Design a protein with these regions (language model features):
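Thiol-based oxidoreductase modules, predominantly thioredoxin-like and allied folds used
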Residues: 30-44
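Major-groove DNA-recognition helix of helix-turn-helix-type DNA-binding domains
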Residues: 49-52
């Protein structure tokens, strides 16, 4: 049995690409933790420090960052779990 990947999505409620990323993950059966950086300044600072990004979405898959809704990179990192 494969262990599930640890997925964190840094997002904001008004971000359309964030909603698409979350829907994409959900439709494929992946669970994730959603962090609303508009309400969590520390998380916003942490993601900026780790990735250099101030925009969302940023997805961490087992601590490997994916910036934006990059399907190819998301699929590549999740391939071993499908």
């Amino acid at each position: 049995m494969k262990t599930a990947p640890r997925i964190v999505v840094f997002s904001t409620p008004s971000c359309g690409w964030c909603r698409k990323v979350k829907s994409y993950l959900k439709d494929r059966g992946f669970r994730y933790r959603d962090v609303d950086i508009s309400k969590d300044d520390k998380a916003a600072q942490d993601v900026q420090r780790k990735t250099g990004q101030t925009s969302v979405p940023v997805i961490l898959i087992n601590n490997r960052p994916v910036v934006g809704f990059n399907r190819q990179e998301i699929d590549r990192l999740l391939k071993q779990y499908t």
